[in-house]
């Protein structure tokens, strides 16, 4: 499943590191199984992360992204609350995970 890690505490306006990962096969639709049958396409296409009602980071994933994608990015801690991350599959299925932060 998805994981999101941020510092537990930060000062208002402090730049922090947000680290995320999701366990996912990231199948391109090009690989064949042991019987020679094409494995169906199934990959994360979009990632977003919001904090305090603002988009902090977004990314489009393409076929070159390996399984279990990991992202690390910088963001400003604006207020106490959560960093809300969403991964969207090419099927439309969404995975969400949040991490709490206390801002002083």
Identify the role of each PLM range:
Residues 2-61, 66:
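Contiguous segments within soluble domain cores/interaction surfaces
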Residues 100-104:
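Short beta-strand edge segments in extracellular beta-sheet folds
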Residues 81-89:
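Short, aromatic- and glycine-rich surface loops/edge beta-strands on solvent-exposed regions
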Residues 69-73:
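Short strand-edge motifs at loop-to-beta-strand transitions and within beta-strands
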Residues 15, 78-82:
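Extracellular Ig-like/FN3 beta-sandwich strand-entry sites
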Residues 88-97:
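Short acidic/polar inter-strand loop motif in beta-rich domains
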């Amino acid at each position: 499943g998805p994981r999101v890690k941020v510092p537990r505490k930060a000062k208002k306006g402090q730049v922090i590191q947000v680290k995320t990962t999701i366990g996912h096969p990231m199948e391109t639709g090009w690989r064949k199984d042991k019987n020679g049958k094409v494995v169906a396409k199934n990959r994360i296409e979009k990632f977003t992360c919001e904090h305090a009602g603002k988009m902090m980071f977004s990314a489009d994933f393409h076929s070159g992204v390996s399984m279990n994608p990991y992202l690390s990015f910088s963001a400003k801690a604006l207020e106490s609350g959560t960093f809300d991350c969403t991964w969207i599959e090419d099927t439309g299925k969404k995975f969400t995970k949040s991490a709490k932060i206390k801002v002083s």
